[in-house]
Amino acid sequence: MAEYTLPDLDYDYGALEPHISGQINELHHSKHHATYVKGVNDAIAKLEEARANGDHAAIFLNEKNLAFHLGGHINHSIWWKNLSPNGGDKPTGELAAAIDDQFGSFDKFQAQFTAAANGLQGSGWAVLGYDSLGGRLLTFQLYDQQANVPLGIIPLLQVDMWEHAFYLQYKNVKADYVKAFWNVVNWDDVQNRFAAATSKTSGLIFG
């Protein structure tokens, strides 16, 4: 079975400046994200060993570790695609219509998502997701890398609120970081995720 690998970025580390510094992106990608990838592969190897030995305590421990590190790998893989040096502005098309319908307007959605990000206690993410069962857009505060978002939610847009994502540049002023984030949102990527989520899911079953 193939190992998980660190994805390449579609842009240089410094391409998102001045909104997100090249120093942050380099550390974030080559160190933090890479650590999650290693953690996934290590947890799987330890799970296989624990299963072979019938060690259920070790199985449960490494399943927990796997959830955390795989969550980190998935979240960051989406994060890099959600960003673009040509980003910003607002969504268009069906995604824009869905946001207007379900949040009242883009400005109201942006305010709600921003509040979710700034109000997060500790480490985690703000997430715009598509509820494949109810067929609606929802925002969530995702705790750590894997908690507080129900199964069946397909992530469309995420902002990383772990301190490693902003502290070197914005210190403890999270609000300035989140404000800057909107300038590099890759709405084409978010729209593509929305189109796939709405066309390839039915209830909790992928078509």
From Swiss-Prot:
Principal localisation: secreted
Protein name: Superoxide dismutase [Mn]
PANTHER family in the record: SUPEROXIDE DISMUTASE 2, SUPEROXIDE DISMUTASE [MN], MITOCHONDRIAL
Top-rank taxon: Bacteria
Xref: PROSITE patterns: SOD_MN
Any single Pfam family the record assigns to this protein: Sod_Fe_C
Gene (UniProt): sodA
Subunit structure: Homotetramer.
Source organism: Mycolicibacterium smegmatis (Mycobacterium smegmatis)
Keywords: Manganese, Metal-binding, Oxidoreductase, Secreted
